[in-house]
Amino acid sequence: MKFKITLFILSVLLLATSCRPTKHVPQGEYLLNRVKIEVDNKDVKSSSLKPYLRQQPNHKTFGIIGLPLAFYNMSGTKDNRWNRFMRKIGTPPVIYDSILTEKSRVEIQKAMKNKGYAEAEVTADTVIKKRKIKVTYNVKSNTPYKLNRVTYNIPDDSISKYTTLKDSTQYLLKKGTLFDYYILDSERERIAKELNDRGYYAFNKEYITYTADTTVGDHLVDLEVNLLPYPIAKPDGTGVVFVKHRPYTIRDVYFYTDYNPMNVDQRYTVVDTAYYEG
């Protein structure tokens, strides 16, 4: 019975404080009540742009009730046990910051550019009501840039054969593909992994670069995939020389027929070695 009464009182308090979400919002400031991203292109999901938001409102259970904020609002200004407890289990109100809003707008626009929408426009609109503010980021994608022609400038034949795929439908870079930074980077990672699997352990995606020609017109891009040579320091320390990438190969294989991994002493024992040339 006591538990039910406590639960009832707590529910009443939560209901009462939920009606005053701006209780701890300083005068002249606004509670960030809602943030929304609207994109005019169905190919770009608004959820993919949320990671670029620099400020988001307080969490709301089921998107309706802000319980953490409600708990925080149950605290008063005095420094006592009750107020400290409610502030600990709750979260303070998110105060609207115009600087963070502008940073979010810029980051969203950069993200759109990376997705191939170089001419995208992003605006941040605000609506104020009763010391609460709603921010809406309106994204106008405009015409995206797409790949027109893709060529591979790989002068090393031992590597160029591993950059192509048997099934052309699996190519990430092909005519009509969005000039998307993430797709371009995925192709670099694919080539690097393929070469690593072939023994080029020192190879990484940084050796793959792109040259893009956007003068084709009609929002088309001619793309060239380039291979950078491998740098090696000169023995005299005066600089570096560039050489071809080389795969690692197995030189010698040794078989220890009576080796016992459980015997610690054997790990440091010199064994007789017989060499065989096949």
Where is each model-derived feature located?
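Immediate N-terminus of the mature polypeptide
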Residues: 2-3, 15-278
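Bacterial N-terminal signal peptides
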Residues: 8-16
